[in-house]
Amino acid sequence: MQYKNWVVIITGGGTGVGAAAALMLAKGGAKITINYSRSATEAETTAKACQELGGETLVCQGDVSNDDDCRRIVAETIEKWGRVDGLMNNAGTTQFVADNSLEALSADDFLRIYHVNVVGAYQMARAVAPSMQEQGKGSIVNTSSIAGVMGVGSSIAYAASKGAMNTMTISLARLLAPEIRVNAIAPGFITGRWWLDKLGQEGYDKMVSGVEKSVPLNHAGTPEDMAEAAVFLLTASRNITGEILISDAGMHLGGAPLIAR
């Protein structure tokens, strides 16, 4: 699939699924705004790799929980390339809670996670919608999680935020049609630094092995697996909107450990 001259904003685009999607789009000649909040080095590295693959890039720092930052990210993209064809809301945060006690999460924890995972995605959609509506077309893909479907994951606050993102995706799909399609991917376990940083190498290796043994497809999902789903919804699925596409090697079918991205 070619994405020649497609202009796409990817929040949280310097690492993980966002970086994998940026590289995939770059191979087809896309123009990509790579947003990051704190991972400046990783964002610059991803941008350089995209350029080597034939893509054009703009690296843009910004916190999606800040509405001014969201509007600036979109404005800088339009200033550079004149339009926005796609938005991938991939920026996200969580809080790992090992304790089963309800006291392990505070109201502030919930609000912090919601401000990034839900409000941030909404603010980016709101910022980009006028440009897409004016040109008569556009596509938004939200990176959700199987946590929002199954009520599992790193914490109740995280799972609840992804459930809210799923509902918001459907609401935005209704509101922004027919010009703009809005969909989401719901990854299961994803290999990479999120779990590695939390568990250490030994614990991470055990988790990957456990996932591979327990899910129906015997496969631990990679950032590239999720990027394929996201790029499909973003660019090729003109008849699909309001869809939550689960990509979890069958974890949601049951018999899987209670883990998620």
Feature roles, as predicted:
Residues 2, 122, 219-247, 252:
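C-terminal substrate-recognition "lid" of short-chain dehydrogenase/reductases
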Residues 7, 12-16:
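Conserved glycine-rich cofactor-binding loop
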Residues 70, 98-102, 106-111, 140, ...:
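Substrate-binding pocket helix/loop in short-chain dehydrogenase/reductase
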Residues 125, 161, 169:
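Active-site helix of classical SDR
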Residues 130, 173-178:
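Alpha-helical segment proximal to the catalytic Tyr-Lys
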Residues 145:
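Residue(s) in the substrate-gating loop at a strand-loop-helix junction
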Residues 177-181, 240-242:
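Short, small/polar-rich loop/turn modules that mediate ligand/substrate recognition or access, typified
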